[in-house]
Amino acid sequence: MCGLAGIVGEVDLMEQVLLHMSAAQNHRGKETPNSWVSSFIDARVGLMHNRMKTIDMAVAPKQPFEDNDTGLVVMLDGEIFNYEDVRRQLENYYSFTTRGMCEVITKAYDRWGDGCFDRFEGYFSIVIYNRWSEELLLCRDRFGIKPLYYATQRGNLFFASEIKALFAGGIRSLLSAERWASYLAYSTYGSPYETFWEGVHQLPAGFLLHYNGYSLVEKRWYEFEKRVSLWSEESPERLPEAFLEQMHRSVGYSLMGEMEKGLSLNGSLESALFISLMKEIGLPRSLKSYMHYRGKLHQSGVLWSAEMLAETPLPMEQVKITKSMLLKELDYLARWQEEPIDGLNTITYSAFFRVMHKLSLIHISEPTRQAEIS
C-alpha cells in the first residue's frame, strides 16, 4: 500500500499543500514522504508519494521516481508481480540503473505507450508525468483494486489515493445530494466514476486519464468482456489445464516478497483450493495462517480449516471477533470512511485486520484477494 497525491496548476505554496495531502493519507505509507515539483505548460506539476514496501524491499528506489533516459516521472501504488519478466523483455532496448518496479514502468511506457499496462500482471494505480511532452497520465488496474480519485478546482487538477487527501489539498467537501438520495432509496453506489461528493470523481477500473494542461481525456485500456471472450476460442479439453495454470500463477504471486505474511482462511472451497495449490508450489518460510470467526467456534469453518492445514507445517491461529470489537470498529469506520461501507463483512474484516496490525503483519493473503494493512 502506498499513497499517491498530485496537483497540476497554479497553486500557492504547492509543496506545502502536497505535504497536507500526504499527511491526510500517511497511514498508507509510514516512510518519510517524497515530493517532486516542476514546471508544467504555464503552471506547475507537483507529485507526492507515501511508501509502504511489500515486495522489492531492498531494491525499491524512492518515489516519485525520475528516469532521465525516458524523461518520465512515475509513482506506483500496488504491485506488478511479473515486473522481472517485463524487464527481461526490455533489456535488449534499454539499460537499467535500478532493480525496482518503477524503472520497469518508465521503460515499458516509453516502449509500448498505453499498451504497456496490458502486459502488467498485478493490482496498481500508476501516475506518469512526461517531462518532455508535459503530459500527465493516471492509470487504474483492471478491477479497481487500488483507489485513485481526482477533482478540478479553479482550473487546477488534484488527484490522490483517498478522498480525504483531496480535501486536505483544498478541494471543497460538499456532499452529493443526488448520490446520497439514490443510495438511501435504492442502495446504489452510482456509476463507476462517481463518488458521494460533488466534483470528486474516481478513475474507473481499467481506465486511463490523460491530461495535457488543457483537457482531461478518459480512455478504457482493459475490457473484461473482451478478455473473457478470448477463452471461448480455447478447446474444451484445454480449458481445465489453462485454468490450473492461471491459478498456480495467481497463488504464486500472492506469496511473493520478502516480508512476513499472514494467510487468512475462511473454511471455504476457495481456501481448500488455495492450500492445495500452495502445497504444490512450496510454502514460504515467513508465512503464518489465521482465521477469524464470529459466534461459536464449532459453527464456523475454523475446524475444517485446521483439518485442511494438518498436512502442512503451517500453524493456524484463531481470531474471535466479538460484539464489542465490531461496535468499536463501526465507530472507527464511521469517522474514517468518506463513503458508505458495504455491510457487516467490512466491519468484521476491519476488526480482523486491526488484530493483524497489532501482530505487526501488514501483508495478508487470502484465497480470493490480498490486503495491505496500515
Identify the residue ranges that each predicted region occupies.
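Aromatic/hydrophobic pocket-lining residues that form π-stacking "cages" and hydrophobic walls in ligand
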Residues: S305, F352, H363-I364
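Cysteine-centered catalytic environments shared across enzyme families
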Residues: M1-E338, Y349
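A conserved donor-nucleotide-binding helix/loop in the catalytic core
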Residues: L344-H357
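Glycine-rich phosphate-binding loop signature in dinucleotide/nucleotide-binding domains
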Residues: G257-E258, M356-L361
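Single conserved hydrophobic/aromatic residue that forms the stacking wall/gate
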Residues: I362-E366, Q370-S374
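Active-site rim elements
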Residues: I341
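Short acidic/polar active-site loop segments enriched in Thr and Asp
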Residues: E31, L361-I362
